[in-house]
Amino acid sequence: MMKVKKLIAAGCAMILALTGCGAKQETPASAAKESSAVSSAVVNDAKESSMISSSAVSDAEGSTTASSVVSSEQSAESEKIKLTIEGYDKDNFPRLDGSLANEPLLLRMISDLTDTDADTAEVYLADSFVNGGTSTSWGKLLYDNMDLIISYEPPQEVKEEYVEMFDRLEIDPLGRDGLVFIVNVNNPIESLTVDQIRDIYTGKITDWSEVGGEPGKIRAFQRNSTSGSQTLLNKLVMNGEKTMEPEKDMLVGTMGELIESVAGFDGSGSAIGFSVYYYAEKMKSDPNLKMIRIEDVAPSNATIEDGTYPLVNDFYMAIRASEKSDSPVRKLRDWMLSENGKELLEEEG
């Protein structure tokens, strides 16, 4: 009997070795878990695949967008109107001058006429444009063989000095700009009336509390009497009244200096100054400054163009009246006064 039991035990051991008999058996629950794990792995793989596909799509879309932007910019550049005048090229171009705020327009004209980039055009323009300002440009056209100027209205002193000479010029309004008033961003004042500004610059109003601001002395910057912007102040604001004599440190030589002075004046926000819109907005924009509304109208291209902004004035293009009808200078003047010229002005802002 014992032999039989030993034989059975030996046989069972052999079977276990060969078949795994007696090993842990898989239950329906564990099978389900393994199946679920496999399914989850498949789902995760699918999700990763989807994410990769989405990323690829996003990359493709981004690439397409970037390409579209570049293409749009290139298209816009190619669609710009081109100023070409027979007789002008990079070896023969006009001598141009004007007000500082008109320098970008003059550069564009030289760039087009010489078919060069802006940097090269700046070198060409430097031969005639010496940044002497509004009054200087009128004198240079009369006496210095300047071909053409684009400038703001000449100051009264210049008109009186050259009163008989202006008959020798052909002067045409070319565009419109606005006289704007700037204060430090820390100044709570948002709007002033023309009367209030006049009273500030005559010295009748001396404290910001008199115009709704916080108590503090008003420090009003001015420019010299022959500058274009001071001329606009006298014409558009002062109404025949004289501006007060500025303190020594309140009188600055250039528009750039005025803007820098107002922006940085002792950090108190008590300063006020003025400029023309194009220069203050496009050429010398400063995050420490803000333009205030006049009669509650903010200066902008639109409000200056339609005249709803109260302080607007033309700027001018002038040549000598003696220019022959077929001269390149006169052809340039005529082109700038045409519809093409208006389009170029709009492109330059």
Predicted regions and their residues:
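Bacterial N-terminal signal peptides that target proteins for export
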Residues: M1-G11
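Repetitive helical segments and hydrophobic/amphipathic motifs
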Residues: M14-I15
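Bacterial signal peptide processing site
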Residues: G22-K24
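Exported/periplasmic ABC-transporter solute-binding proteins
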Residues: V42, A66, V70, Q74-E160, ...
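C-terminal motif of bacterial Sec signal peptides marking the signal peptidase cleavage site
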Residues: L18-G20
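Small/flexible residues
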Residues: L7, E26-T27
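Disordered, low-complexity tails and leader-like regions
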Residues: M2-K3, A37, G62, T116
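Intrinsically disordered, low-complexity serine/threonine-rich repeat tracts
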Residues: P28-S78
